[in-house]
Amino acid sequence: MKPAELKRLYRIVKVQLEYGLDELLPEHHLTRAPLLARKSLFWLRNQHADKALGDRLRLALQELGPVWIKFGQMMSTRRDLFPPHIADPLAMLQDKVAPFDGLQAKQLIEEELGAPLETWFDDFDIKPLASASIAQVHTAKLKSNGRDVVLKVIRPDIRPQIDADIKLMYRVARIVAKALPEARRLKPVEVVREYEKTLLDELDLRREAANAIQLRRNFENSEELYVPEVLTDFCNETVMVSERIYGIQVSDLAGLHANGTNMKLLAERGVSVFFTQVFRDSFFHADMHPGNVFVNPNHPENPQWIGLDCGIVGTLNSEDKRYLAENFLAFFNRDYRRVAQLHVDSGWVPLDTNVDEFEVAIRMVCEPIFAKPLCEISFGHVLLNLFNTARRFNMEVQPQLVLLQKTLLYVEGLGRQLYPQLDLWQTAKPFLEKWMANQVGPQAFLHALKERAPLWFEKMPELPELLYDSLKQGRNLNQRLDNLYQGYRQSKRQQGTGKFLFGVGATLVVCSAIWISNQLEPLAIGSATIGVLCWLLSWRAYRQ
């Protein structure tokens, strides 16, 4: 390790010990040495013994800085790996850090755009509107039309810091995976790899711009969701410019009530927006925490959601969507056999899974949920319970489903915060049933025909050539198969000859032994010679 890495590692260990995180080390013969070393560091005692372990972990990550804050946020979404007393406090981590100098931000933007800001913008505010671990946001006006915009710029020198901390995370994850068999279930290296990908994706604002453009297109002219316009002429890897919006933060309940917002409709529209993104578009905003969601103050009787920060999105393929919809419907119909079979059919659990045992396990976990009224049942926790049960049957981690479950928990939490009586099932069931109905029957056939017809017509002129190639390949394949079959038959014949000669040779050798005992040496020698010759011919036949 380099001196800088050792210094950073000491800082990380120091913070962990000051928050008593050595409690996370399991009782194991391999952890005795670290625990003994910990006792020798008498000056690094747990200074927060009055706090719960989950809260101490949250505070430690917050003190270690941006990379670790985001890592904690990701850990909070992996409830299939971490228990509630760890995941719940981590969900409260706030990605807010001190801003860097606004003049430096202005200089960075000018370097990326290749000219002074005054060329395109007026009233650039040196004071940032918001500051997070990866980027910060400033406001300005477009010189051409006076339109209010926001300029998002990646923090300077953030990449080396991320690379250094990720490298240390990998080192620790590999040590933990090798040294502690109990920790392998958590797949520490895979968790770090998933986090690294998420973090590096957020460093490229072109990706966020593309996501925002796609989401805006999907909800164009929609009364339910508005996505600010991205000004692509001013976007690159480290700078993104978009329309500035004025709204009420979704967590500001007092402000929403003061504006006369229809809270019931707003909550129901949040559910509708989520299921529309998932099942209609197969493309959903996967970071819908309250800081990224606002409400349009205009027309409060017909409220509209506003979605910001599209850095993290999720996608589902058609098979995942179908299995997910059928899982929800089967669960709420209490058809646990169907739920178990769907997990096997989808490939989420191994094909050799005992469906009967899996059904019993799902029933034991899910049946108590129905002790509550349907309106109190959490969709997100239903998914969580299903995934946790499936993990016992070797279900592989499905990243797209983890993102979906996290987003569903956000949307559901926001919806019930806005309108506690929100019946998520009554809101979602018609949507799911309608979507499933569109996947089967004449309407689904016509839809599939409509989608594929242009491709078929495009390929029709190539059909004769494709048919000729297929026939030619078929003839060549038949010839190769015939040659293989003839070779197989010849091999079988040779093996049969070899077996026959081996048997004759063995018989003659036995006979030679009998004739020797009866003083018939000439016959014995001749018989043995012919027997050995038969064995040699048999060996030759097998070799061929």
UniProtKB/Swiss-Prot annotation:
List residues traversing the bilayer. 496-516, 519-539
Q: In which pathway does it act?
A: Cofactor biosynthesis; ubiquinone biosynthesis [regulation]
A GO BP term here is: ubiquinone biosynthetic process
Keywords from the named record = ATP-binding, Cell inner membrane, Cell membrane, Kinase, Membrane, Nucleotide-binding, Transferase, Transmembrane, Transmembrane helix, Ubiquinone biosynthesis
Listed InterPro entries = ABC1_dom, Kinase-like_dom_sf, UbiB, UbiB_bact, UbiB_kinase
The organism named in the record is Vibrio cholerae serotype O1 (strain ATCC 39315 / El Tor Inaba N16961)
What HAMAP family is this protein classified in?
Answer: UbiB
Its protein name is Probable protein kinase UbiB
What is the recorded function of this protein according to its Swiss-Prot or TrEMBL entry? Is probably a protein kinase regulator of UbiI activity which is involved in aerobic coenzyme Q (ubiquinone) biosynthesis.
What EC number(s) would the UniProt record show?
Answer: 2.7.-.-
